[in-house]
């Protein structure tokens, strides 16, 4: 994806002295292009670190995003600096051999980035269409094979000119020009852009249709399933509970509905984020892949060098703006970016070993002053959950529950308003260990052993995970 230098159109067989450098223009271009390159390098490194440092982002979908960031990082760190120098000087200063290698690496990285977006679009289609079956369809092994195919195909498309599939090179080594051999131009344009673009658009059209249909069905199911007084859908399944056959069927149906709603909501969010990425990709790369074939097949209609350079750098811009898109459209990435920038990776890894803590509080009348900040979830005659806060991905809930009688391990007072706080880090299906105890410890033999009640909870609010 290398453009003609200023004198490349002259088929000269002699080496011209390099033109003088305009100092003011060189400084201006150096600041602009240098800032763009630095932003692209740091931004893509930030994407990679955000996924690497957060275990909840270790999924096949996020590995695809890391692959995209790796391709963009290679482009911004190994190709763009030489492109910027070429632009500033106005001639190629690194020799013929390096020109050919540089052009091949350019095509390799750009094609890998575009094909990576293609794989992501297929992944989102599967995630939205089959949210419950997605983990069995998209496994880590299959994801790795898909990424290997991306890089293998990109390599095949990029190495053609290195083996002679190009027009004769000019003898002037200060000229590094795009490969305008019509056969290769058609092959690379189809393989690098138009075929992936077609797949991407088809997949996202399917995603839009499925998401619209599923949203309508799931939202109507949510409205009929919850009572008028509840603002949050809550499913609690006590382990070893004795219920009738109809109750088991009803509980399973409600659980299946809640899990499907939760998973679909997450996949829909990811599809929206990556839809923005794809939209920016089309806007950035389409001008270049329109200009390049026109210049190759219709020389009389060749665009001006200025138009070509704008289209050329617009394509490069795509590799620098993806790190902006993620935090702006995804709360998940925004928090991950903030943690990395605050150097909280190590701290989060250490704290992830203790995903649940509890503290004892006074009875519920103490919380009456905070009532306006609470979300009450009535779940039974003896139990009530209160949502206290939700910060940095951690949901804090308070449960008020009467303790069971006759417990062999019971060494605490049976206070019907005993309260504990559960800090839950997961945003999806939650298993919460609620430790219940009194506000004042007893002096029994085993007073340090809390009474444990295990609940499996799935939480969602208006179809969104908590």
UniProtKB/Swiss-Prot annotation:
InterPro entries cross-referenced by the UniProt entry: ADR_fam, ADRA1A_rcpt, GPCR_Rhodpsn, GPCR_Rhodpsn_7TM
GO CC field: caveola; cytoplasm; nuclear membrane; nucleus; plasma membrane
Keyword Membrane: yes
Disulphide connectivity of cysteines: 99-176
Pfam families given in the database record: 7tm_1
UniProt similarity note: Belongs to the G-protein coupled receptor 1 family. Adrenergic receptor subfamily. ADRA1A sub-subfamily.
The protein's name: Alpha-1A adrenergic receptor
This protein's encoding gene: ADRA1A
């Amino acid at each position: 994806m290398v453009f003609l230098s200023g004198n490349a159109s002259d088929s000269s067989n002699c080496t011209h002295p390099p033109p003088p450098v305009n100092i003011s223009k060189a400084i201006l271009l150096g600041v602009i292009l240098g800032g763009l390159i630095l932003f692209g390098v740091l931004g893509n490194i930030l994407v990679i670190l955000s996924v690497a440092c957060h275990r909840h982002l270790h999924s096949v979908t996020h590995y695809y995003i890391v692959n995209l960031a790796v391709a963009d990082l290679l482009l911004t760190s190994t190709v763009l600096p030489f492109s910027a120098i070429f632009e500033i000087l106005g001639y190629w200063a690194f020799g013929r051999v390096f020109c050919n290698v540089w052009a091949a690496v350019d095509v390799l990285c750009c094609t890998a980035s575009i094909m990576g977006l293609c794989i992501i679009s297929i992944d989102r289609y599967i995630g939205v269409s089959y949210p419950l079956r997605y983990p069995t369809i998209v496994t880590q092994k299959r994801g790795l094979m898909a990424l290997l195919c991306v890089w293998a195909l990109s390599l095949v498309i990029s190495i053609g000119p290195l083996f002679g599939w190009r027009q004769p090179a000019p003898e002037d080594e200060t000229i590094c020009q795009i490969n305008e051999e019509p056969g290769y131009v058609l092959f690379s344009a189809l393989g690098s852009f138009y075929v992936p673009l077609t797949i991407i658009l088809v997949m996202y059209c399917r995603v839009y249709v499925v998401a619209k249909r599923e949203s309508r069905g799931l939202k109507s199911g949510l409205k009929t399933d919850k009572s008028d007084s509840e603002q949050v859908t809550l499913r609690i399944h006590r382990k070893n509970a004795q219920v009738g056959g109809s109750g088991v069927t009803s509980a399973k149906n409600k659980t299946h509905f809640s899990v499907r709603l939760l998973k679909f909501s997450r996949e829909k969010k990811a599809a929206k984020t990556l839809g923005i990425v794809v939209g920016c990709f089309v806007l950035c790369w389409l001008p270049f892949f329109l200009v390049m074939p026109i210049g190759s097949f219709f020389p009389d209609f060749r665009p001006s060098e200025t138009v070509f350079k704008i289209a050329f750098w617009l394509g490069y811009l795509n590799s620098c703006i993806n790190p902006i898109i993620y935090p702006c459209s995804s709360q998940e990435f925004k928090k991950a970016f903030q943690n990395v920038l605050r150097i909280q990776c190590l701290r989060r890894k250490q704290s992830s070993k203790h995903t649940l803590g509890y503290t004892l509080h006074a009875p519920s009348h103490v919380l009456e002053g905070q009532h306006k900040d609470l979300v009450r979830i009535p779940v039974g005659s003896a139990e009530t959950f209160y949502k206290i806060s939700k910060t940095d991905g951690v949901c804090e809930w308070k449960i008020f529950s009467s303790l069971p009688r006759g417990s062999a391990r019971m060494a605490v007072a049976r206070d019907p308003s005993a309260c504990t706080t559960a800090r839950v880090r997961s945003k999806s299906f939650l298993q919460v260990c609620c430790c219940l105890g009194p506000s004042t410890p007893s002096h029994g033999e085993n007073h340090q052993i809390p009474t444990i009640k295990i609940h499996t909870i799935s939480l969602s609010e208006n179809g969104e995970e908590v």
